Amino acid sequence: MSSRWNRTIYVGNLPGDIRKCEVEDLFYKYGPIVDIDLKIPPRPPGYAFVEFEDPRDADDAIYGRDGYDFDGCRLRVEIAHGGRRFSPSVDRYSSSYSASRAPSRRSDYRVLVTGLPPSASWQDLKDHMRKAGDVCFSEVFPDRKGMSGVVDYSNYDDMKYAIRKLDATEFRNAFSSAYIRVREYESRSVSRSPDDSKSYRSRSRSRGPSCSYSSKSRSVSPARSISPRSRPLSRSRSLYSSVSRSQSRSKSRSRSRSNSPVSPVISG
């Protein structure tokens, strides 16, 4: 996971008419903000991703704003990749900690869940997936289509049963619902479908550093930074080739003159 997610928070249950400047007003006091990505779906609630410069500021924002009442809406604030940081206000969102801060168990019997609504938390996912068996770990994270998650089962049979029973089922929480897909997790699998994984990787490589959340980095395109270096190089090559051609012509002319027969002089 990119380090920017350590300093990016998810803000859920926002009013449907909220503006970006109002989101900034809610969080600016906790530290410098790099970017705010506000999403207003056709049906509320809205949500946003707020990136801070410092991960500690993100922690402070979670502690200060999770559960905050904004215009009659109780905000839900957690670290963007599933609530992996601990604070008293987000303990219920983080599967990595219990009440005593003991780390949760992991296993090799893992499934990938895609198509989750943006408001889904690890606890929502765990509640849904435990219908198929004993869940020992769950985590959610944002992707380009919304949210995805991973769920670890304590045994192989429960994992296989979850794929059969819960694939293409309706996931619900207090805020929204969506139909999800469940498949066995592979080490190379990510939060996108197998059909478009190759094209997405190739596109992301071509974009390079310009895919950052920062507005400054978005304004810099790798293609623009490379082209000024490539153009002088092509000119220098063409100049060199033209000079070499002219030199070869002059040498060939001088050879032809030196090798041409001298006409005899006829005296009268």
Swiss-Prot record:
Expression across tissues: Ubiquitous.
GO cellular component: cytosol; nuclear speck; nucleus; spliceosomal complex
Keyword Ribosomal protein: no
Annotated S-S bridges: none
Keyword annotations of the record: Cytoplasm, mRNA processing, mRNA splicing, Nucleus, Phosphoprotein, Repeat, RNA-binding, Spliceosome
GO biological process: mRNA processing; RNA splicing
Annotated PROSITE patterns: RRM
Induction of its expression: Up-regulated by paraquat, high salt and early after high-light irradiation. Down-regulated by cold.
Domain of life: Eukaryota
Gene Ontology molecular function, alphabetical: RNA binding
Compositionally biased residues, Low complexity: 207-247, 257-268
One Pfam family it belongs to: RRM_1
Miscellaneous field: The splicing pattern of the pre-mRNA is regulated in a tissue-specific manner and by development, and changes in response to various types of stress treatment or light regimes.
UniProt function note: Regulatory splicing factor that modulates alternative splicing and gene expression in specific cell types. Autoregulates its own expression. Probably involved in intron recognition and spliceosome assembly.
Subunit and partners: Component of the spliceosome. Interacts with SNRNP35, CYP59 and CYP63.
Name of the protein in its database record: Serine/arginine-rich splicing factor SR30
